[in-house]
Regions:
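Short Gly/Ser/Thr- and Asp/Glu-enriched loop/turn motifs at secondary-structure junctions
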Residues: 191-195, 230-231, 334, 429
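Catalytic palm active-site di-aspartate
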Residues: 112-116, 160, 164, 186-204
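Acidic, divalent-metal-binding catalytic cores of TOPRIM
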Residues: 310-507
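The start of beta-strands in P-loop NTPase/AAA+ ATPase cores
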Residues: 107-109, 190, 241, 337, ...
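Catalytic micro-motifs at enzyme active sites that drive phosphoryl/nucleotidyl and oxygen chemistry
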Residues: 94-103, 186, 324-328, 420-422
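Right-hand nucleic-acid polymerase module
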Residues: 1-43, 52-76, 80-121, 126-140, ...
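Glycine- and acidic
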Residues: 48, 113, 157-161, 331-339, ...
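Helix N-cap motif at beta-to-alpha junctions
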Residues: 203-207, 440-441
Length: 507
């Protein structure tokens, strides 16, 4: 079964999503969907709280499958019609606040409107009725009710569920088409990003019909089952700072300078005091990371438009601030030891070994009552972002040498380790461990690292050697003695670490 049109019963629906029929029954009628949720609040930009209802376990997995199936169905409809609407820009692959803002760049007038209590507007009956009556689905009543049961919490689409975004977009398509028709009537461009509606135009005489447009649009929105938040309705002129979904769009797309400066100040407060505020309330480091990531998203977009060079050695001021934050979060203020490995597969092997020997390394790993392993260390995960900001390759031991330079300041712009020691007045919370393969031959990563010029004095080198411990995990004792002799040439001491199943072979 590969299409929604083929679903006639609850069992058909379970087969369609490839979930056991008895599991679907258990979720819906035994444990019941509402029992899978946990609710919490996150701060909004204006200081208010946003309520998040997040599902877990089997229900969350089921919602992910439903969302993916709906997205595939939506794409097939667009393909059949030979079109892809450019109205909605939220919750869709390839679209973002940037693509939404780009439509309204460099316009004479911009009108922003907001739908009040957006997700609460999609109640159980509305969700059920959509899948039962919409021409793209026309599902049986029983199946439509099941979808609403899976998707709703306390009778409404919850903000925080994987299936809520795609369902809200599907239901809003009718509203979007009607609003687009009105927008064209008044010679306006129209886009929607979730609950944010934006209209823009270069038409000089739009002000003459502005009140009629707002009145007609508001009436249509009310008829569609939504409410306009009048406090957020605003018309912005070209000679003012025009913002669309948080981005300035007067000439080029950019982030509000006040937002950038405030983020920089928050980071400095975190570095110097260990804490910071957002809108007067205590905040956490993940929120600050979100702000830096938001700013960087716009820099990335603009970098693609110019012909300048952009890499770890050609960063703008905002990117340098983000790089400093990345170092602080991952290499200075991390709460558990961090292990950096040579290759991508090393982490997989290390985790497998620790899980097998977890009883002998309780300081590194433990197993809880449910049988889940809990690591007390973290493994560094490389990404394109680390390559861009730090010049670290996605694989191989040379990247560790590059990382080490940011601890010494040699061959890079800044010694971040000394910088954070100075401004924080605190020591590094946990160690960073560079884990190399025990290959000291020429052209091997370990040899290159040992030859690295850290830019320190002979006295500092000797202190470093005295404090440095190289722990080797050799295949044989003969191999250990061989590498120990080679390391002695560098003035380094070495110890061996043997796993229990190796000790027999080394006696």
């Amino acid at each position: 079964m590969g299409n929604f049109s083929e679903i006639k019963t609850r069992n058909d629906f379970a087969d369609f999503l490839r979930i056991p029929r008895n599991k679907l029954t258990h979720i819906l009628y035994v444990k019941k969907p509402d029992s899978y949720y946990k609710t919490f609040e996150i701060p909004k930009k204006n200081g208010d709280k946003r309520k998040i209802c997040a599902p877990s376990g089997d229900l969350k997995s089921l919602q992910v499958k439903l969302a993916n199936a709906l997205w595939v169905h939506q794409k097939s409809i667009w393909t059949s019609a030979g079109t892809k609407p450019n109205i909605s820009h939220a919750f869709e692959k390839g679209k973002s606040i940037v693509t939404n803002a780009k439509v309204h760049r460099n316009k004479r007038f911009i009108l922003n409107m907001d739908l009040e209590c957006f997700f609460d507007s999609f109640h159980f009956g509305r969700v059920c009725g959509y899948f039962e009556k919409n021409k793209d689905f026309l599902l049986p009543r029983e199946v439509s009710i099941i979808i609403a049961q899976i998707a709703c919490y306390n009778g409404r689409l919850p903000q925080g569920a994987p299936s809520s975004p795609i369902i809200s977009n599907l239901i809003c398509q009718v509203l979007d088409m009607h609003l687009l028709k009105i927008a064209k009537k008044y010679r306006l461009d129209y886009t929607r990003y979730a609950d944010d509606l934006t209209f823009s135009t270069n038409n000089r005489v739009f002000l003459d019909s502005y009140e009629d447009f707002v009145k007609e649009t508001t009436a249509l929105i009310l008829k569609a089952g939504f409410t306009v938040n009048k406090k957020k309705t605003r018309l912005i002129y070209r000679d003012s700072k025009q913002e669309v979904t948080g981005l300035v769009v007067n000439k080029k797309i950019s982030v509000n300078h006040t937002y950038v400066r405030t983020t920089k100040a928050m980071a400095h407060q975190l570095y110097t005091t260990g804490e910071f505020l957002i809108d007067g309330a205590p905040a956490n480091i993940r929120q600050l990371e979100g702000r830096f990531s938001f700013i960087d998203q716009i820099d990335l977009y603009n970098n693609r438009l110019d012909e300048s060079k952009h890499d770890a050695y050609h960063l703008n001021g905002r990117e340098l601030q983000y790089r400093a934050f990345m170092f602080y979060k991952n290499f200075y203020a991390h709460e558990v030891p961090l292990i950096v490995t040579e290759g991508k597969t090393d982490v997989r092997y290390l985790k497998a070994a620790l899980m097998k020997l977890y009883t002998q390394y309780p300081s590194l790993i433990e197993k809880d009552d449910t049988g889940r392993f809990i690591f007390k260390i973290k493994f560094f995960q490389r990404s394109k972002r680390w390559k861009y900001f730090f010049g670290m390759s996605l694989d191989g031991g040379d990247a560790m040498k590059v990382l080490y330079r940011y601890f010494t300041g040699k061959k890079v712009a800044k010694d971040y380790f000394s910088y954070f020691q100075r401004i924080t007045g605190r020591r590094q919370l946990s160690p960073v461990i560079l884990l190399y393969d025990n290959e000291i031959e020429s052209k091997k990563p370990l040899k290159a690292f040992l030859n690295e010029d850290a830019g320190i004095t002979e006295l500092q080198k000797q202190e470093l050697k005295n404090n440095l411990q190289l722990r080797l995990l050799p295949d044989t004792m003969r191999a250990f003695l061989k590498y120990k002799a080679k390391l002695r040439r560098y003035g380094l001491k070495a110890q061996t670490v043997l796993f229990p199943d190796q000790r027999r072979n080394h006696r």
